[in-house]
């Protein structure tokens, strides 16, 4: 297993106060806040949800709090030499996780009084592991699901994205976007970045006409052309490097 940083591209800070809570993620957040009071002999929590659902953000918050090491499968059968608490990112049978290494990490963490936070798209207890002992261990894992966001969460996430980049956007524009966008965290990231790029490229404010253009492009798939354009954050970073 190799150590990899969590994906913090859409996060301004791995701070508990920076995480937006709603019905979709309240249970998962409650379990993160309850640590180290996690049930079971092995003290393992499994956060389950689709990509960009907030699993990595919660993992980062927990990692900062516990000093956890973040791991992702790379074909290495040896568990890390240091650490008592671990975040295992994007756990999946299909992604080549070494079952023997995972089994030994579960046992070692329990013996050391540590904890495991498993991030996955489906419950690890329902995955078709071949190793019977590992399957037995994972059946006892506590599961907390992150559900699709509601309108209130989508609006707050959009506000946060633009506020973090010091970009002004009005409530009517936000309401327009929320009423027409897909109910997913991934959609927030993609649409907000597209607005950011178009605003920079065309030197336009984040207005209702711009939002209409972006949402129309997402409806017909033309937004893919915008991916080659830099966001204001990316351009600022480039200018700083050149100076």
Feature-to-residue mapping (PLM):
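Short regulatory helix/loop adjacent to the ATP-binding pocket of P-loop NTPases
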Residues: 124-139
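Conserved AAA+ ATPase "SRH/arginine-finger" region at the nucleotide-binding site
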Residues: 141-153
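Walker A/P-loop nucleotide-binding motif
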Residues: 40-58
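Conserved small helical "lid"/interfacial subdomain of P-loop NTPases
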Residues: 150-170
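Post-Walker A helix-loop "phosphate-sensing" segment adjacent to the P-loop in P-loop NTPases
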Residues: 63-74, 82-83
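Conserved nucleotide-sensing/catalytic segment adjacent to the nucleotide-binding pocket
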Residues: 80-120
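C-terminal helical "lid" of AAA+/P-loop NTPase domains
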Residues: 175-179, 186-200
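A short, basic N-terminal segment
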Residues: 1-34, 38-39, 200, 204-243
């Amino acid at each position: 297993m190799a150590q990899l940083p969590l994906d913090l591209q859409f996060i301004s800070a791995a701070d508990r106060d920076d995480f937006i809570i709603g019905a979709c993620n309240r249970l998962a957040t409650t379990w993160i806040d309850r640590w180290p009071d996690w049930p079971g002999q092995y003290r393992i929590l499994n956060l389950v949800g689709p990509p960009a659902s907030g699993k990595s953000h919660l993992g980062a918050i927990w990692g900062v709090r516990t000093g956890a090491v973040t791991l992702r499968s790379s074909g290495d059968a040896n568990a890390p030499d240091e650490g008592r608490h671990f975040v295992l990112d994007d756990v999946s049978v299909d992604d080549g996780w070494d079952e023997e290494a995972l089994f030994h990490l579960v046992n070692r963490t329990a013996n050391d009084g540590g904890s495991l936070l498993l991030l996955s798209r489906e419950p690890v207890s329902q995955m078709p592991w071949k190793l019977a002992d590992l399957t037995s261990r994972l059946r006892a894992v506590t599961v907390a699901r992150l559900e699709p966001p509601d309108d209130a969460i989508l609006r707050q996430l959009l506000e946060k994205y633009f506020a973090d980049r010091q970009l002004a956007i009005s409530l009517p524009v936000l309401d327009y976007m929320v009423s027409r966008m897909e109910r997913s965290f991934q959609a927030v990231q993609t649409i907000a970045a597209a607005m950011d790029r178009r605003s920079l490229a065309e030197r336009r404010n984040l207005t209702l006409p711009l939002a209409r253009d972006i949402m129309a492009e997402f409806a017909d798939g033309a937004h893919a052309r915008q991916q080659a354009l830099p966001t204001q954050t990316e351009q600022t970073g480039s200018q700083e490097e050149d100076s």
